[in-house]
Regions:
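Non-catalytic structural scaffold of enzyme domains
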Residues: 1-267
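Short "domain-exit" segments at the C-terminal end of structured domains
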Residues: 268-273
Length: 273
């Protein structure tokens, strides 16, 4: 089956966190169109079982295929950890996650071989980052810390709030004590807290933003497969966003962090089957 290189990229997440990945694709791959699905009716994924996350991911990928996408980005660390292998085996379309691109950069950047990973309970508990980092460099020691309150704080829009500062300081103290020199922001919500995390961890710690690294990895994948967009097909709304609930709240959040707002269309809630 011939894939149209000017077809859009499918991106999905449990909610608004994946917008950080969409933002980096918009910035770094300006010839690409995007169809985004935020599963806002079922957020968060971090507390759900592997079987449930695989089922949700299958439903969303089928929905994105109906939108004629040419590749899919699983812009959710939890879904990348639990569902990526299953959906790659099942669907005949290029699919990438957000874990491997960030881990590659962390392995290259660390000087003392002590790498921290923060994420949801599910992501950190999966051990997938540690497994991949150890594969890249067996000498690396990985310290994981689940930060379950970060997602609701971001979803509430409390990006620069004393409560968020206090919560972050408590979570990150353990990693400070472990003297990590590289920290993977292992949830797509977390780059929105980058300034808070930077303030606590200090300038000596390299903060790895998997959203940015994933956009670059996507660009390489598209070039390799001859699918890079040429940007010749004009479209009133090259960026289309779908959610399963709370479209107004999603729209307000998207408006606060995304560029090119005049090119974005956000649809009313839809439920993938």
């Amino acid at each position: 089956m011939k894939i149209d290189r000017d077809a859009p990229i499918g991106v999905f997440d449990s909610g608004v966190g994946g917008l950080t990945v969409a933002r980096e694709i918009m910035r770094n791959l300006p010839s690409e169109k995007i169809v985004y699905f935020g599963d806002t009716a079922r957020v968060p994924y971090g507390s759900k079982s592997k079987e449930t996350i695989i089922r949700y991911s299958r439903q969303i990928i089928r929905f994105l295929q109906q939108q004629q996408v040419k590749a899919i980005v699983v812009a959710c660390n939890t879904a990348s950890a639990f569902a990526l292998d299953a959906v790659r085996d099942e669907f005949d379309i290029p699919i990438i996650g957000v874990i491997e691109p960030g881990a590659k950069v962390a392995a290259a950047q660390t000087r003392n071989k002590r790498v921290g990973i923060i994420g949801t309970v599910g992501t950190v508990g999966s051990g997938i980052h540690a497994e991949y980092l150890k594969h890249l460099d067996p000498e690396i020691t990985v310290f994981g810390k689940a930060c379950p309150l970060f997602v609701p704080l971001v979803e509430e829009g409390w990006l620069h709030d004393p409560v968020t500062d206090e919560v972050a300081a408590r979570y990150l103290k353990e990693l400070q004590d472990k003297q990590v020199d590289t920290l993977i922001l292992g949830c797509t919500h977390y780059p929105l807290l980058r300034s808070t995390i930077r303030k606590i961890m200090g300038d000596g710690v390299c903060l790895v933003n998997p959203a940015y690294e994933t956009a670059l990895e996507l660009g390489r994948l598209l070039e390799e497969k001859g699918l890079a967009g040429e940007g010749t097909e004009k479209n009133e709304f090259p960026y289309r966003f779908y959610v399963s609930d709370l479209a107004d709240e999603f729209k307000a959040f998207a408006n606060s962090i995304l560029p090119y707002l005049s090119l974005i269309h956000i649809s009313e809630p839809t439920r993938p089957e």
